[in-house]
Amino acid sequence: MSMTGLLQDVVQTLVFRQAPANGKIGSFAVRDTFNDKFDGRSLAVAAFGLLEEMRQQGYGNLISPTFAKRLDGYLNTLGADQLEFYLYYQMQKKTKAYPVNLQLVRQIQAEHPNNIAVQAMSFALLAKGGKADEVFAQAQSLQELFDQAFAQGKYFDHKLIDLKGLQAYYLQGLLSLYTRNTADKKEVEKLIVAQIVSLLKSRSAYGLWSWSETTNYLVLEALNYALDQYYIHQSQATKCVLKV
């Protein structure tokens, strides 16, 4: 079976297995917590992610301005002592009304080189707007962190986003980087293939092998994104051939 067929099969199978009663994958950003307990921060980030999805889909007029303002005020308190939550909050931003402070993200990334969660989320954010050569160097360093973590058996079970969830963010960042003009495109492609293969190996008879539904959703999202980019690439290649 080709990689395309394999990806399609996996995504369709996991959509069925992970789907709630209404038969669809929910777009609710968070369904668990970082520490396997109820946490107001994760709930707030979840609410923000849902509101951003509503804004992006054209339903922003249904959002209570008062609630949105109070939520923004709370989320703006996430700072240096809560780096992972801060970056996770940044990952939910989708509209122009909520731009990501890439300078601050870059600073956080530089100050915490061995924190794989910080590195994965900052990479996914910077891959869209950071300098391509710097982002590629970060991608290589991040791959080394993942290799070390998997070799040591560190999966961060019972966390909101375990190692596979972070790897899904890594894949999304690589796909974003691949769409940009970079001299390292072939190397980026190799890293993309490696992440896809690794994530596909995470399947079990019951879907993705993770305690966290949020992680499962992130992996599905990343694999869907990979499929989208593949079809876009194939479409562009076909157009070039037809022109010739």
Residue ranges of predicted features:
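Preference for long, amphipathic alpha-helical scaffolds in soluble/luminal domains
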Residues: M1-V244
